[in-house]
Amino acid sequence: MEEFIKKNVDEEDVKSMMFNSIRGNERFVQIINTPLILSRLIEIVRYKKEIPHSEGEIIAEFLNCLLLREKEEKQDARLDIKRLTYLLRMIAFESLENKEANSGMTESEIIKYCVKAMDTYKFEYDTLYALDIMLQLGILEKRENMYVFSHQAYQDHYYAMEELAVIQS
């Protein structure tokens, strides 16, 4: 793990924060012991200069940072993080409720899930633009004309957000 950090992190302050967070903290080392979680944690530390302490927090913060960075760097007035998050929540929720795990979705299924999100939460948004952003940021991938979440952890995160909203309503 230390070799991975040395090899993939140039910024001394980020290296220092990473090393300080893992020294003597075996539980945290176990949490970040996969390349996905470790690489996402590095990106969070680069962007926010803070360390989330659970796998769920790391995934949530990474996805949030990804959207914030895209909004700030591109200065894209059409990128509405809140609405995009509602769409991702519904896509994750509906796809997991209707299918097994991270199985593929057609474009028409994704559009249907997005329309449901917009109806449920009473907003409008350009669905094809949103889908393009989700693909550009690597939240979703297109494989053989089917769309999937790039990582099961992303789908699980957005599913949990929507499930909580359903329970609380």
Language-model features, listed with the residues they occupy:
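Extended hydrophobic
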Residues: 1-166
